[in-house]
Amino acid sequence: MDFNREHKINFLYVLAAMVGVLLIQSLVSQPDHIRTIPYSEFQQLASQGKVTDLVVGPTRITGTLKDAPKDSPRHFSTLRVDQALAQSLTNENVTFSGEPEPGPWPTILGWLMPIVGFALVWMFLIRPMSMGPGMDGMMSIGKSKARVYVEKDIKVTFADVAGVDEAKDELKEVVSFLRDPRSYGRLGARVPKGVLLVGPPGTGKTLLARAVAGEAGVAFFSISGSEFVEMFVGVGAARVRDLFEQARKHAPAIVFIDELDSLGRARGSAFPGGGGHDEKEQTLNQLLAELDGFDTSIGVVLLAATNRPEILDPALLRAGRFDRQVLVDRPDKKGRAQILEVHLKKIALAPGVPVDDIAALTPGFSGADLANLVNEAAILATRRHAENVSLDDFTQAIERIVAGLEKRNRLLNAHEREVVAHHEMGHALVAMTLPGVDMVQKISIIPHGIAALGYTIQRPTEERFLMDRAELMNRMAVLLGGRAAERLIFADVSTGAADDLAKASAIARSMVVRFGMDPTLGQVAYEPETTSALGLPNGSEWRPRQYGEQTAAAIDAAVRELIETASACAFSILQANRGLLESAARDLLAKETMSGEELQALLSQLGGGAASASVLRDGGDGAADAGQDRSGEHRALTVEGGEAQ
C-alpha cells in the first residue's frame, strides 16, 4: 500500500474542511444589525442630538440611534476623521466613551480556535474510526487486516522447526522458488499457486509458514480467515482484493491465511436444506477469482493452514488453486525427540536427562503439547527451588497434563478410598495379564482434575496404526476391569466406572457398525465416520440412519454381547487373582501412588490370562485402522479413572 499517497489524501480532506470552517466563520462574524454610515451623516445626527452610547476608537466610532425607524438597524458605525470630535460632542451634550484599538491577538485567536477545534475532533474521533483497532476502521473497512512482517522481522527458520521433516522438504521447494522465481520456468515447470498445510491443532503449521518466509527472506502477510468477513456486505471480497494487491506490491512475498476453513467452507453447507451464508460465499468467490488470476512468476506464494480439510470447497482444492497439500501430522517418537531438543535449549536441564525417554513417555503429543510440557516441567522445578530441571519434573508434568491437577483437598471417606483403590488396581491387573495391551506406567488414588478420583496411566511400547479384533476386545476388558473389581470385592458397582463404560461402549459400537467385526451382522459399515481424516470430530450435521428397526435391534444386541464378553474376561482374571488384587489394593491405599516398576513386581504372581485371552479371540477376526478409529491416536497415553459424581 502507498502510505505517502494515503496520508496526502487525508491531508487534503483536512485542508478542505479547514477552509470551509474559515469561510463559515467569516460569514458569521459579519454582523447584519450594524449600519455603516458616512462621517458627515454622523456629524449631522450628532448635532441634532439623535445619537447616544457612542464608543470612540482610534479609527472607528460605533453607537446607537435614538429614534431609528422600525425597519432600520438602531446601531451604526462610521470611520473617525475628525480629531476635534471630543470637543464637538461635549458642546452638543452627547455621551460618549473611548476604547483602545484591540491588538492582533483577538483576531488571530478568532481564526485559530475553529482550526484547533476541528483538529481535535479529527484526532480523537475521525482518525480512530479510520485507523484504530478498537473501532475496526469504519473509513478503512474494505482494507485488508493482514499483518505485514518485512524480511528483518522474521527470525524463524527451518532450524526452529523439528519433527516434520517431510513437510519441511516439501516447503524447501517454495523457498527456492522465492529466491529465484525464473529458474522454475527454464524447463516449463510451474510452481503451485497455493500450498495448503493440513494437520491437527498444535502441529506447527503456522510456524512452518513463518519459517518459509524467514528462510526466503521475503515479506510475510499473515491473516486469519475469520478476519475477512464483517457485518457489512461486500467487505470480505474487498479485503481479499486489497490483500492480493498489497502482496503484489511487496513481491516477492508470502501470503498466509490461517484457519482457512472459516473462509473456504463448502458453499451451500450452512444449512442442511441448502442456501448458505451469502457474504461468506461472496468472499470465497473473490478468493477463487484472485487465485485464477494469480501470476506466480511475480514471486508471490499463497500458503494456508487448516485442521478441517474435509469441509473445504472442492473448487478451492482443485488443480491450479490450492493444488498441493502438505500433511503436518503429530510427530512420531523420533520427531518428538527432535522437537524436545529444540525446546530444551531454552531451559536449565539437569545433566544426563535422556531425551529419548521423555519422547517415549509422550505418545500422541503434538509440537505445542511438547512445548507446554517443557514449560510445565520448568515451572515445577522452579517451584521446588531446584538448580535445574530433572526427569522427575517431566514425569510430574506429564501427569498434570494427562490426568489434571492433584486435588488433595477433595477428601474421600474410608469406604470410597477402598472402592477407588480396588477399581484402579483392577484396571492395572487386567492390563498386565492380557497380551498386546499397553504397559501400565502408574496408578494413583489421589483425586485429579475435575472429576477423576484416581487414575491408571498406560504407555504404549511402540507406534501402532492398526488394531485387530483381539486387541480391541482386550482394550475393552481393561476399561471394564475397574468395574469388575468393584463387583468382585463389594458385590456392587459404583458411579465411578461411568466414563470407562462409555469408552468401552464406543469401541464395541465401532466394531459392529464401522469395522464389520460382528459375524452375525457381517462386513457392512452401517454408520459413517465420526471423525475426520485427522482424527478430529468432523462436526457434520446429523444424518438419518440407513438401516431399519430390526437391524438397529441386532446392532444393539451385538454391542451388548461384546461388552458382556469383555466384562466376563476381566471378571475371570480378577477372580483368579483375588488375593493379589486385595493385597495390591492395600498397598495402594498405604502409598496412594504406585509406579510401573512396583507393579512389574506383581507380574510373576498373576495367572489366568491365557484362558481369558482365548475367550476374547472367539467370535471372528479382523483389523481396525487405529489411524481412522482414533480410539487411541498413535496409541497415545491411556488414562482410566474413577469418576466423581
From Swiss-Prot:
Look up and give the membrane topology term.
Multi-pass membrane protein
Where is there biased composition of kind Basic and acidic residues?
Answer: 627-637
Q: Which residues cross the membrane?
A: 9-29, 106-126
- Give the cofactors, semicolon-separated: Zn(2+)
Q: State how the cofactor is bound.
A: Binds 1 zinc ion per subunit.
The residue spans the entry assigns to the Periplasmic side of the membrane are as follows 30-105
Active-site feature positions: E424
Q: Enumerate the residues binding ATP.
A: G199, P200, P201, G202, T203, G204, K205, T206
Instruction: Name the UniProt key words of this record, in alphabetical order.
Output: ATP-binding, Cell inner membrane, Cell membrane, Hydrolase, Membrane, Metal-binding, Metalloprotease, Nucleotide-binding, Plasmid, Protease, Transmembrane, Transmembrane helix, Zinc
Family designation: In the central section; belongs to the AAA ATPase family. In the C-terminal section; belongs to the peptidase M41 family.
- Protein name, entry field: ATP-dependent zinc metalloprotease FtsH
Q: Which gene encodes it?
A: ftsH
